Amino acid sequence: MPESLKLPYLQKDETRGDYQVWIVDGAYIRGHIDEEFTNFGQHYRYPYIPDKEFWIDREAEHDERIFFIEHLLVEHDLMAKGASYADAITQADQVERRERRRFGDIRKVTHQGKQLPDPSAVHERLWKKLENGVSVWVVNGRLVRSAFDIDFTAGGHDHVYEFVPEGEVWIDDAIEENERGFVLLHELHERNRMAGGIPYSKAHNESSHLEFRCRHHPDELHDALAAEGWA
């Protein structure tokens, strides 16, 4: 890691065998080291993380550390033995899903297991309804990951995720307040581009570049959001 960058450690968490778990400043990592850093990571997925360390992003809501640690133990062990990331994450996801089910998360959005998962059950609060009819919701990210998509991170919208109702954008409540505006910009820009016929890969890359620029030039965020209909 370049010397000009600060270390993102916030708090030493638990130790699991040879592994040290750290709570880290994910917003700083995404803004200065790796814009694609998600909720957690380990060395073989993100080489800038020292070996035998697990990094978990500081969460604004809903403690998911136990799920992430169980995932990382499997993922790191398999990749250390030569498994590909694709194979390792498949097995790690299975372990994580089992833990989430054991803690009763899925029952909370399926009316105690009697119905299919209800998207409205993950709504925390309506952030804003835009003039074009799109509703932006802050959602319970833990329940989204438990019931709909274990890889859901930061935000999403109806043009990418089939479980997001039509005309909705979701912002993960695990993202801290001071970072939500950048995630919101990414999701609105990406959705607008896809609604205009641009394929996901291109729309996502454009949105990532725009988000990254505004993270480094936060004075531009207000105007960038306005251009996407956030007025």
Which residue ranges define each predicted feature?
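Active-site recognition of the HExxH zinc-binding catalytic motif
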Residues: F67-M79, F182-R191
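Metalloprotease/metallohydrolase-associated module, dominated by Zn2+-dependent proteases
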Residues: M1-I66, A80-G181, A195-A231
